[in-house]
Amino acid sequence: MEDLFTGKLVRLSGIDPAELSSSFARWHRDSEFKRLLDFDPARLYSAKAIKEWMEKHLESKKDAFWFSIRTLEDDCLIGDIDLMVTNWSSGEAFVGVGIGERDFWGKGYGTDAMNVILRYAFLELNLRRVSLDVFEYNERAVRSYQKAGFQLEGRQRQYIQREGRRWDVLYMGILREEWMEDYGNRSSDR
């Protein structure tokens, strides 16, 4: 049996607010990271404020499965990923991922983390659909999500403004049966 929380490049671990909050504060000082990740205007928060927010979030969000992303090679904390179950009866969830350490951008770590969380979503939580949204200008993320099996399901035109221009938000999703078919093909390659 495979370790549910380990991929080819990363492993998911529990959230440690004390550790992750200082990394979050540093990552969120990177305006490019912030603008690729979030609808909100870029702003700065202290590690203390982030830690307090994380602790409240972890306590109150019983339908959220939130993990740190660590490299297998040296156990380096490089990002986080969360899966928010939006409807248990229909098996729906929303996923978000952020690789905060720039040295790991564009090298497959985010895609690997997404593959791990999808395995968890479909094999452990028995979900039917996982969805996400992404800004159209985040082409690297769109390619990563497509590699993980997500398909474009819709767009909200001119939803976000960045640098004086309006951009679309793309909505992508993957169904359990689509993932299972691809997972079976990957499993037989081993």
Per-segment meaning from a language model:
Residues 1-51, 178-190:
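A short, well-structured alpha-helix characteristic of acyl/acetyltransferase catalytic modules
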Residues 43-103, 175-178, 187-189:
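Acetyl-CoA-dependent GNAT
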Residues 101-103, 107, 123, 136-137:
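Active-site acidic-Proline motif in GNAT/NAT acetyltransferases
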Residues 106-120, 142-147:
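Conserved acetyl-CoA-binding loop-helix of GNAT-fold acetyltransferases
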Residues 110, 114, 137-141, 158-163:
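Short glycine/proline-centered loop/turn elements that form peptide/ligand docking sites
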Residues 123-133:
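Conserved GNAT acetyl-CoA-binding A-motif
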Residues 131-134, 151-168:
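Conserved catalytic-core motifs of GNAT/GCN5-like acyltransferases
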Residues 145, 150, 172:
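Conserved active-site tyrosine of GNAT-family acetyltransferases
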